[in-house]
Each structure stands twice: as C-alpha cells, then as structure tokens.
Amino acid sequence: MKRPIDWREDRSAVREKVAESAHCVLPIVLIVVLLCLTAAPMKPDLLLSFLIGGVMLVVGMGLFSLGAEQSMTPIGTKIGTALTRTKNLPLILGVSFALGFAITVAEPDLQVLAETVPHISSTVLLLTVGVGVGLFMVVCMLRIVTGANLRWLLIGCYALIFLLAAFSDPDFLGIAFDSGGVTTGPMTVPFILAMGLGVSNIRSDRRAEADSFGLVALCSVGPILAVLILGFFYQGSNAVADLSSASFGSSTAIGGAFLASIPLYLKEMAISMLPIVAIFFLFQVTLLRLPGRSLAKILIGILYTYVGLVLFLTGVNVGFSPLGAELGAELAVHGWLLVPLAMMLGWFIISAEPAVGVLEKQIESVSAGAIPGKVIQRSLSVAIALAMGLSMLRVLTGISILWFLVPGYGIALALSFFVPDIYTAIAFDSGGVASGPMTATFMLQFVMGASSALGGNILRDAFGVVALVAMMPLLSIQAVGFVYERRAKRTAAAPEQYGDFDIVELWEDAA
C-alpha cells in the first residue's frame, strides 16, 4: 500500500522555512525601524507598508525556499541523471540551455532587478540574462564531461569581460555585473548544482564530483557578458529610476495597493514558471516516469514556489523597497556617515543569510574540519561590510566600479594559483550566497535613494552594489583557504613530537 503524503510533515517544514526567512529579514527590519524612529523621519503609512511588506517577504521566502527544495532540486537531479543515461551529448547540451534559460527567467532576485532598472525593458533584460545563463550552462556541462580546468576558464572569461567593459556604455556596467550577482539566487543555485551533480555521474574518475563545483561561478559569467554585449546594440530609453516617495494616505489605501498588485504577479509568475513546468512534464512522459507519490511531492513543491514568488515580489515592490530608497535619501544628508552605516547593514545582512550556513558546512567538509564555520562567517561578514562601504564610497565620489572590480577579480584569480582548486570553485560559487534577496531588494534601493538625494548618476554610481557584494567572498574565502593550507603544511613539516606514553629509544644495541 502506498504511503500518502504526510501533511503534518509538510506543515512542519513550512514553519521551519518561514522561521529561517524571518531570521534573515528581521535584523534589517529592526535596524530600519530604529533609524526611522531616531535619525530618518518617515511617514507612518510608508513605515506601515514596509512592515506589511516585510511579513509578506518572510512568508514568501519561506514558501519559495521549501518549494525550490521539494521541486527544483529534484527536477534538476533527476533530469541530469536521465540525460546522462542517454549518453547523447547534443541532447544534454540542448536541454541544459533550455533549462538554464527557463530557471533564470523565474529567479526572484532577477525579477526585482529587472523592475528596478529604468532604461532597459524588463522583458529585454530577463531574456538577455536568460540566454547568458543558458549558454554558460552548456559551457558548464562541457566542462564536467571533459574535465576542463576551472581556473583557466574563469581567467579567460573575466579577461573577455573586462575587455568588453573597457569599450561598453558606462550606463550598462553596473547593471551587467549586478545581473551576474542576482542570477545566482535561491531558485537558480540549487537547480544548477543538482543538475551538475547528476551529469557528473557520466564520469567515474576522482575529480568528477569536485568538477560539479564551480558551475554557479561560470553561470554568473553568462549574464555579465550578455548584458555588456546588449549595451553595444540596445538603444535604452531615457527613463530615470522612479524613486518618488510613496504615499498611501490611509490604511485602506495600503491594503488596496497590496491587493491590486497580487493579480499582476500571479500572471507574471505563471508566465515565468510555465517553461520549467512544461520541460519537466516533457521529461516525465518520456524519460523520468516518476511514481505518483514522487510526482505529487514535486507538484506541491512547484505550487509552494509559485505562491512564495507572488508573495515575495508583492511584498518587495509594494512595501519593502520603497522605504529603502526613502531611507537612503533621508540619511544622505549625513554625508560620509553613510559609509559606516552601510557597513553595519552589510554585516547584519550576511550574518542573517540562511544560505551562509550551507556554505560553512561545505567548507568544513572540504577542509576536513580544519576551517571552522565561525571563521568563514566572520570573514564573510567583514567582506560584505567592506563591499557595502565601497558601494557608498562610489555614491559619494562617483568613482567608476571598474576601479574596484578589476583589481578585486585580479587578486581573486591570482589567489587561485595558491589554493587548492576546490577552494577556488567554492569561493566563486559563494558569490551567490552573499548577494541574496536582502541585497537585491533592500540595499540596492537604499543606495539608489542616497545617490538620487546627492544628485549623482544612479545608473553609474548606485548600480554595481550587488556586484561588489558578490565579488568579496571570492577574496575572503580563498584568503582563509590560503592561510589554513599554509598552516597545514607547516604542521606537516614540523618534527615529530613524542606523546606522553611513547617509548623513546635513547641508544641502540651494538650489532
């Protein structure tokens, strides 16, 4: 007799995921409320809409995380394994492109960025980034099959990126690098990793599993290249970012704004998720043929993902982000105090990201416990605090983002020659961990608000904050790996120490 789906277990999982997302969002909400009550006066209706948006964000992120875990990860693994069994390389590459495109278009962080960019149509940006990820999913699969070295692939890709950046429209620079950061979000990362692990089974050598790392790093390159190339051909509009202060007037108007937005996002997310669902059902009737219970669990996961995305985007766009921009504008009068304030927000953002815990366990496992999780968390907190400080420095001075990205990536790629390959792969993968939902939804709006209030160029000075946040873990994790590897080598080279109960031969008997 088939065991029915345990709904009590499902409810428990929902509560757990909502609690995780509350842990992620709550520190930012508390800091913002404290600032609104002391240093940055806000209209009560705007603060109330922010709090309602925060609740929707928490519930939406929780449902989405559970849904992605129950649907996107198993879909990626099962399709990857099924493709491997066919031994058909053109089919593997074609499906990888289609799935990379489809999963990216539904990525919530990318949806938020596309709505924020003023001079590029959101549809054009979504399609461009989707094509970029799809093409580099093909590159990822070829790398797994052939065992190509990740370091040299990354060096070649970033050399091409900075060559294009030197000649591209400055208005596209920050957006291009931000696109690479937000693409590796909570929808895309589990799917890419799962599919890569499934396809890596095509090889039986020791490096096969290690080569399944680094997929996120390569898929982050695709959107940057795609948007930079778009800048050479696309005539953007003259629109400017809409940072006008939201005003609701009454509590019923706030409720009306949220209720009016829900049908819009129900339609948008249905269109965005349709390709993923269609591809899955095509595989279900041809190669997978999952049993009823497994299929039902995946379908329930897809429903959770859909509802979570709708709540997430409604909460972000109606309530959460508008106050971020307004807060940045209010605090801009304090000038250079913006730098330490942004650093404090950066510290709390990364400390609260639920995906950081997964990264800590991954590195502890790879280092056989030599690198404690707390060391990784501290290094990431310092790195993201510095990234936010540098972002605000750009707003205050107008320095081009290339002055930070070129040396940053140069040092990160140079470090890859001095640490084991696995650390490089994990470090480049971890950029998506740092540039999570809080950076895309709140911090970008905060920086845009400050830039607008100071009379800066939002496209050139504010965009790029996600890129800096995504870059810093490449440096911090490899630096930690380098220090611990050196320490391990010194320990191995040290003379043997005798234990308390070892027998020590002081002389040898004459032969």
Residues covered by each model-derived region:
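Juxtamembrane and boundary regions of transmembrane helices in multi-pass small-molecule transporters
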Residues: 1-2, 140-154, 171, 203-248, ...
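Hydrophobic core segments of alpha-helical transmembrane domains in multi-pass membrane transport
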Residues: 24-39, 53-63, 95-102, 132-143, ...
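Intrinsically disordered, low-complexity non-transmembrane regions of multi-pass membrane transporters
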Residues: 1-21, 25, 76-90, 204-215, ...
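Helix-loop-helix junctions within the multi-pass membrane cores of secondary transporters/permeases
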Residues: 80-82, 89-160, 339-416
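Transmembrane helix-loop junctions in multi-pass membrane proteins
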Residues: 34-48, 68-76, 102-117, 136-147, ...
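N-terminal alpha-helical transmembrane segments of multi-pass membrane transport
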Residues: 1-94, 98, 275-307, 311-313, ...
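Transmembrane helical segments that form the transport core of multi-pass membrane transport proteins
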Residues: 49-52, 246-355
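Interfacial loop-to-helix junctions that mark the boundaries of transmembrane helices
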Residues: 15-21, 42-52, 84, 117-126, ...
